[in-house]
Design a protein with these regions (language model features):
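Extracellular glycan-associated modules
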Residues: 1-298, 302-304
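Asp-box/BNR beta-propeller blade signature and adjacent active/binding-site loops
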Residues: 290, 298-745
């Protein structure tokens, strides 16, 4: 069932061809609300306003639509949001309702193609088309040449001789493991100079360079089981990309196509140019003069579409950006999605950031409106913030627990001061302009360092009232940046506060924040904060949340956990795997860590069947692999740090969740951004069936912009993935088990 099920709305479909940036379509109303979809910097761009919100959305992953070839475009719009499809597959979505009903009076849609842009086959549909219906309406790309024999004709070979970029498609199979050979080859003057093969290493594409050296591009894997496979080699934009069965398997810098073949006079399939044949067969193949996009390649392989809905994005509830997803399915079946709401600028702290949630009562098909759960005063870079939520549920009583970082105004991880900022009871320690310290008591009163009463009282939101001689006057706000309020009297410590909030009614109402620094932070730490995403509840009942913190050298961090054996009433910090670690021949510890190569940052946790706890960690080790360690005592101590050879690391947040079934109780799925392109991108999901000891399959979910993510298993057993495109927003996708199971090779 589509995520749009149950919503009425509208759809539009068309085809366009563009050679230059310019307008495509727009919707106008008499009160100046409306929107326009156009091409900017060779990518789609949507901007405008509805009765509910304004938006400006850069669909940067649609780059190169100005290639002069025909593309299909579809838009669906409902009160739950809108989706944009390019060449049959969803390329973007937004919380904005793009339908005429959501804009002003007499809103009408117009085609507005600019110079150098053609539009045809425009249709308006009085219903929300499903992803499958849109795919069926989208034609496959037209090849320059299709193979009808083992050799191309001389005329067709000549057509290829000047192509510096383009796409190769072939459907092949071999006769079983260990049987390999050439899928396609090309040469000139009796010398083979281009070859596409299935080998022991995987799919290999190589081109003979000008200096007589082979330039080799390999997608590592085993596609020799005897099944039919589609292989696509896409060459352009400075890279060679290799797809198998519609999914990106390798993105490799460098560009080499048929124009690199000196005196090209022969192109063959199912054999090399000497006649040595593939141990199998090529059923069909085609060559394209254009660099096909991800959607077009998926269309060639009949990939089933994944339905995605935007839950938080730029403009939603008047905020400039949302980032940092958290996601959980509760015992009741309610699904809770959390996000940082960045009101005026998109940056991390220091910034005005709120914690917000949306909830689903039908397994992620529909979502309620935004709830602002936790907010602090101030605006912009001077505003106080909460950031990086991490969520867990206590299954014993249903309590939903979230740990989150709080910074006062003007403070973030880079400039936070060392210290706790609270007393042994978790009460804020305040200071005035002269450095005198005070305690903010639970009843709102303030006492000085000796416990004496003062003229100050403080409201729950931090507003200070000064009462002298029976007269009240404002005293600023303790959470604001220093110097912002002319009435400033008292401020909290300029440090990081790890805080907890909870809900006992599935996220409908929430507690206020509780400070945890007194239990888990040390005076020498300026930062001690969550690893955003998901925590775990062990079978023993212990709640465990991944964290990381810095020491004497503020730029270097160590991963750890905090844990609670009483449902969140009290917390303890476990040791870091960096404490006592032998690194490059010397013993290190988390307080004095002075090398980034040994640092461990945001982490994710999995409890295994044997009770051990696996932690997978973001890092900048030269290996370029995700760091890992195992605890046998519930996170109190950790074993040696090692690196997961199967998991690429580009210094980005990881997330993992168990996905067990009766026949595979230790199935785990892991996700991260796995490649710099040069931006952070290529979101990949990986599958383990032994609790994360080995990783047997992987599949690229989004080949371009992709940063943080959080996952949960939904009530119907499918995977819910809440993921981000850096600054654009957070998107929810439902992924069936067979999607990742099909990647097993």
């Amino acid at each position: 069932m589509s995520i749009d099920a149950g919503h009425t709305g509208i759809s539009w479909t068309l085809q366009f061809r563009a050679r230059i940036d310019g307008a495509l379509i727009e919707l106008h109303s008499t009160d100046d609300t409306g929107w326009r979809l156009f091409i900017r910097s060779s990518a789609l761009f949507l901007e405008g306003s509805t009765n509910a919100m304004s938006f400006a959305l850069d669909m940067e992953d649609t780059a190169s639509v100005t290639d002069g070839t025909w593309h299909s475009l579809a838009i669906t719009a409902t009160s739950a949001g809108s989706k944009i499809f390019l060449d049959g597959y969803q390329c973007f979505s937004t919380t904005a309702d793009l339908s005429p009903a959501a804009s002003g009076p007499e809103a009408t849609l117009k085609l507005t193609p600019g110079a150098g842009i053609d539009i045809r086959s425009f249709t308006e549909h009085d219903a929300v088309l499903s992803p499958a219906e849109i795919l069926a309406l989208s034609p496959a790309p037209t090849p320059l040449i299709e193979f009808a024999a083992a050799h191309l004709s001389d005329y067709d070979v000549a057509e290829l001789s000047e192509l510096t970029a383009g796409t190769i498609f072939a459907r092949y199979r071999v006769r079983g493991p260990g049987q390999h050979g050439t899928i396609l080859a090309a040469g000139g003057g009796g010398i083979e100079q281009l070859n596409l093969s299935v080998t022991e290493e995987g799919i290999e594409y190589k081109v003979l360079g000008r200096r007589g050296e082979w330039r080799t591009f390999t997608a590592h894997g085993h596609w020799d089981q005897g099944h039919w496979h589609d292989v696509v080699v896409r060459v352009g934009h400075g890279a060679v990309q290799i797809y198998v069965d519609g999914y990106l398997e390798a993105h490799l810098p460098g560009q080499a196509f048929f124009a690199a073949v000196d005196s090209l006079d022969e192109v063959v399939i199912g054999q090399d140019t000497s006649g040595s044949r593939l141990f199998g067969e090529v059923r069909n193949a085609a060559l394209f003069s254009s660099v096909l996009n991800d959607s077009q390649i998926k269309k060639l392989s009949s990939v089933a579409p994944v339905d995605t809905q935007c839950l938080f994005d730029a403009g939603f509830h008047d905020s400039i950006s949302y980032r940092i997803p958290s996601l959980i399915t509760l015992e009741s079946g309610v699904v809770v999605a959390g996000a940082d709401q960045r009101e005026t600028i998109a940056n991390d702290s220091p910034n005005s950031i709120n914690f917000t949630v949306r909830r689903s009562f039908d397994g992620g098909h529909t979502w309620g409106d935004l709830q602002t759960v936790l907010t602090y005063p101030g605006h912009g870079a001077k505003g106080a913030s909460v950031i990086d939520s991490c969520v867990v549920q206590d299954r014993r009583n249903g309590r939903l627990v979230i740990l989150i970082d709080h910074f006062p105004g003007g403070i973030g991880q880079p400039n936070a001061e060392a210290g706790l900022g609270v007393d042994a009871k978790g009460r804020y320690i305040l200071h005035d302009a002269n450095g005198a310290t005070y305690t903010w008591n639970e009843d709102g009163s303030v006492t000085d360092a000796d416990g004496n009463a003062t003229p100050f009282t403080i409201s729950e939101r931090g507003d200070v009232t000064v009462t002298e001689d029976g007269q009240e006057s404002p005293g600023g706000n303790v959470f604001l940046a220093d110097g912002v309020d002319p009435h400033q009297t008292l401020l909290t410590a300029r440090t990081c506060f790890l805080q907890m909030i909870y809900s006992d009614d599935d996220g409908e109402t929430w507690s206020g924040p509780f400070n945890l620094n007194q239990d888990v932070k040390e005076e020498w730490m300026s930062f001690c904060g969550t690893s955003p995403g998901t925590g775990v509840q062990l079978r023993s009942g212990r709640l465990v949340i991944p964290i990381y913190y810095n020491g004497d050298h503020k730029r270097h961090f160590s991963a750890s956990v905090v844990y609670s054996d009483d449902g969140g009433a009290t917390w303890k910090r476990g040791k870091s795997p960096n404490d006592g670690r032998i690194f490059e021949g010397r013993e290190i510890d988390s307080r004095t860590l002075d090398t980034e190569a040994a640092a461990t940052h945001e982490a994710t946790l999995i409890e295994r069947a044997d009770g051990s706890l696996l932690m997978l960690m973001r890092n900048q080790h030269p290996s370029g692999k995700v760091a890992a360690t195992v605890s046998t005592d519930g996170g109190e101590t950790w074993g040696d740090v090692f690196f997961a050879e199967e998991i690429t690391e580009i210094f980005c947040q990881p997330n993992a969740v168990p996905w067990p079934t009766d026949d595979c109780p230790e199935r785990v799925v892991f996700a991260n951004a796995s490649q710099m392109r040069p931006y952070r991108g290529r979101g990949v999901l990986r599958l383990s069936e032994d609790g994360g000891r080995t990783w047997i399959a992987s599949r690229t979910f989004n080949p371009a912009h992709y940063v943080y993510q959080c996952m949960t298993i939904l009530p119907d057993g499918t995977l819910g993935l809440l993921w981000e495109r850096e600054m654009q927003g957070l998107y929810f996708s439902r992924i069936p088990l067979e999607w990742i199971e099909a990647a097993k090779i």
